[in-house]
Amino acid sequence: MSSATLKDVQFIPNAKSGMVSGLLLMPASAKALLVLAHGAGAGMRHKFMQECAAKLAEGGIATLRYQFPYMEKRIKRPDSESMLTDTVRAAVAVAKKNAGGLPLFAGGKSMGGRMTSLAAAKEPLDGVRGLIYFGFPLHAMGKPGAERGDHLAEIKLPMLFLQGSRDGLADLKLLKPLCKKLGKAVELFVIAGGDHSFHMLKSAKRSDDQALSDAVKKTVAWIKKNSGL
């Protein structure tokens, strides 16, 4: 982390959003930049987001974390889908301006990843080479179904799903065949024993930190592969 610089950024997603903030973490030897959206209940400074960005920086991957408008305004209820996807698109544009020519990727935690996928399905995200989901929310808790993944077939990019085997928001019996159907450019990496945020049971042989490290290690390798590095 000592060799990485942290820069505050601000941008306006659309005419109704107001200003939102972001954090650009750029390691000295950055190989690529990942636009990283937060989940529904916690913003870009949440422990998961901070630790994920820090571990990615150690692997040579820069990140742009950012707030959705409702989180910036400290409102509990998420914005409309259109506002969220507009914010994703605007964040990607900001990242591209700050990337210095680095390969660009996008994704996020839970809802942030899904909104990134919806934005990409509607219209390609400028300059983005692949999408990464840290716990894709395929369905509501206790209500298994794959309808929330229908739009993924419209995305013509490599995708990486990082999913805990105990994730209550993504039954692997549904997610595995979905990923297979999407084609060879789509990869599913399962964190054995992890939940939706990769938390491990106390009886597990590895810690939450180790589980996140495994997910990040996979992410770094996948980004490098899809950057031609």
What are the language-model segments listed below?
Residues 108-116:
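Gly/Ala-rich beta-loop-alpha elbow adjacent to hydrolase catalytic centers
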Residues 181-200:
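Catalytic histidine neighborhood in serine/cysteine hydrolases
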Residues 203-229:
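Catalytic active-site module of serine/aspartate enzymes centered on a nucleophile-bearing elbow/loop
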Residues 168-174:
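Conserved alpha/beta-hydrolase "acid-adjacent" motif
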Residues 105-108, 134:
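Short beta-strand immediately N-terminal to the catalytic nucleophile in serine-hydrolase-like folds
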Residues 10-104, 198-208, 228:
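Serine-hydrolase catalytic machinery in alpha/beta-hydrolase-like enzymes
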Residues 126-138:
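A conserved short beta-strand
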Residues 155-156, 161-163, 167:
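Short beta-strand/loop motif that positions the catalytic acidic residue
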